[in-house]
Swiss-Prot record:
InterPro entries: Peptide_deformylase, Peptide_deformylase_sf
EC numbers for this chain: 3.5.1.88
Species the sequence originates in: Synechocystis sp. (strain ATCC 27184 / PCC 6803 / Kazusa)
Residues that hold Fe cation according to the record: 107, 149, 153
This protein's name: Peptide deformylase
Keyword terms, alphabetized: Hydrolase, Iron, Metal-binding, Protein biosynthesis
Function: Removes the formyl group from the N-terminal Met of newly synthesized proteins. Requires at least a dipeptide for an efficient rate of reaction. N-terminal L-methionine is a prerequisite for activity but the enzyme has broad specificity at other positions.
């Protein structure tokens, strides 16, 4: 089942939500599960999509717009207007591939910083859709990577925490006005 929230895949003059950036405490708090999927959650998902498209992103988690809820949106097919975005509520990764891949990542909350990150190539995810219906799907390649990246945000983890090259990361962060002190390396 795919999303039925209709949002034009284009920038809006005034994005409805404000992005938060590396160093903001809201990005480090574990997000709370959503108890009930209702119109307020669907409205939030729609506003997150509008904000994501306006920032030229392909994924966005609620903590990135200052909202401590387990909600993320993903759209790796923005050039296909008929392909609906993914809306995931309370997502959980239930399986990962043994095969890992290293790909350069960026983040709307750390603008202009791009670094290599190692992640599983494929994942299985359970989640609720925007109607509260349980879903279980397999994802691979770019979509799997974006989902993992956004799910990290739901746990207070950012992609810079997963970078294996601290010297290059420090240089890149400094160039963009961010501090290495905001990075919390994960094992």
């Amino acid at each position: 089942m795919t999303a039925t929230i209709l949002v034009e895949k284009q920038k809006v003059d005034r994005p409805p939500l404000e992005l938060h950036y590396l160093g903001d405490k809201v990005l480090r708090q574990p997000a709370k599960r959503i108890a009930k999927v209702d119109d307020s959650i669907r409205k939030l998902a729609k506003e997150m999509l509008q904000t994501m498209y306006s920032a030229n992103g392909i994924g966005l988690a609620a903590p990135q717009v200052g909202i401590n809820k387990q909600l993320l949106v993903v759209d790796c097919e923005q050039d296909k207007p008929d392909e609906p975005p993914l809306i995931m509520i309370n997502p959980q990764i239930t399986r990962t591939s043994e095969e890992l891949c290293v790909v350069e990542e960026g983040c709307l909350s750390v603008p202009n910083v791009y670094m290599d990150v190692t992640r599983p190539r494929a994942i299985e995810v359970t989640y609720k859709d925007e109607h509260g219906r349980p879903q279980k799907r397999l994802f691979a390649e770019l979509t799997a990577r974006v989902i993992q990246h956004e799910m990290d945000h739901l746990n207070g983890v950012m992609f810079v925490d997963r970078v294996d090259n601290p010297l290059a990361l420090a240089e890149s962060l400094k160039k963009e006005g961010f501090s290495m002190q905001a990075v919390k390396p994960v094992a």
